[in-house]
Amino acid sequence: STERSWVSRGAHKLIGALDAFDVSPEGRRCLDAGASTGGFTEVLLDRGAHEIVAADVGYGQLAWSLRSDDRVIVMERTNVRELTAEAIGGPVDLVVADLSFISLATVLPALTACASSQADIVPMVKPQFEVGKERVGAGGVVSDPELRADAVLTVARRAAELGWHAVDVTASP
């Protein structure tokens, strides 16, 4: 069979996580924090999400096919640190996040504020934004396995402080 063409490679990252964690967006209201071109949003739609709030600090990045879908609420020029359930039209049942140039640990309180009490969160941890600039190697890569693990633990601890329970961790494909 032929491989589906997605709007971005981000789609493969979310597919891997949803499958690894057995999380289904079907029938759920979702928040895609850091939507960019919409790879995560496209997967959520493909897997039956009822509605997706696609939030990003950028402007004009979301693919037209997603922007024009009635199930997608586009929130551009939006700092996800300032999101609230009220700002996005009510709480969501699933939060997915693929953020750059910001620590996920600092954004988790806002993502939590947007989530219903029964929500799931599937965040993409990027070590280069969690460990501090002084610990990031050439090209913005954190290659030390201990530092990478520390980044995941930092985010997991912050999530636990906010009432989340880490189910599992998986590497991005």
Model-identified regions with their sequence ranges:
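Residues at the N-terminus of the alpha-helix immediately C-terminal to the conserved SAM/SAH-binding loop
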Residues: 36, 40-41, 58
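S4-like RNA-binding module at protein N-termini
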Residues: 1-23
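Conserved class I S-adenosyl-L-methionine
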Residues: 26-36, 44
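A short glycine-rich, Lys/Arg-flanked "PGG" loop and its adjoining helix->strand segment in the class I
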Residues: 105-122
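Conserved S-adenosyl-L-methionine
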Residues: 43-51, 164-173
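Conserved beta-strand signature within the Rossmann-like core of class I S-adenosyl-L-methionine
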Residues: 118-132
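S-adenosyl-L-methionine
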Residues: 50-106
